[in-house]
Amino acid sequence: EFRRVLFRSFYKTEYASLETAQSLGMTEKDLNKATDALLDYLQDRRDNINVTVAVKGTETKAFNARESSHMVDVRTLYHFAMVLRNVAIILLVASLVYMAVRLKGGMLTIFSINYMKTAILAAVFFAMLAGWAYVDFDAFWTTFHKLAFRNDLWLLNPDTDLMINLFPAEFFSTMVFRIVGMFATGFIGLFVLCYLFLRHQLHKLHGELHHE
């Protein structure tokens, strides 16, 4: 439920910033109605995205057949991402339990060293991606879609498809960099903790050697 609130809060903020409702000739109520249908569909809270909204005073289906087909692919990708996230969490917990049992006292030291090595490599990789997205987001986003989808249903027409007007490049650019920022904050925070722990251990070891 918290994730739903977070998603909707972000969408509403971006809609206000981009003046989406005004540019499309929709009320905020209908704009949120269409968005809720998409988000609920992604999270398996509904079976389709069939909703009716008023666009420039005319009642119409919010999304056509092509958009509905594309959302099937998007939901599949979303579910795959959630599976990867859950597997990563399970592997992390399993690794920590293994180290706790086998390495005991040295667990935190080994974990900190390995995490810092991995974090540095990951930081370089994601910094390159972020740099690419910052310099040419359109090329970055197009490449992502070509890699993520096996068809061209993601190529929507702004003259006929509401979805691409709801979520223009500026919308996704903000979303991508916000996600990167959230992950970076977590990575950097844990990196600093690992660094401080290792420095403490080195000072402790140095003190013991000096005492001897």
Task: Report each predicted region and the residues it spans.
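Short, small-residue-biased leader/transition segments that mark boundaries at the very start
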Residues: 1-6
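Alpha-helical transmembrane signal-anchor/signal-peptide segments
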Residues: 7-24, 145-146
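Hydrophobic alpha-helical transmembrane segments
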Residues: 22-35, 57-68, 117-136
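Alpha-helical transmembrane segments of integral membrane proteins, especially early/N-terminal helices
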Residues: 36-56, 140-148
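Individual transmembrane alpha-helix segments
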Residues: 44-88, 169-182
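Juxtamembrane interface at the cytosolic side of transmembrane helices
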Residues: 89-137, 189-212
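Juxtamembrane non-transmembrane "cap" segments at the membrane-aqueous interface
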Residues: 134-159
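Short, membrane-exposed interhelical loops at transmembrane-helix boundaries
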Residues: 150-174
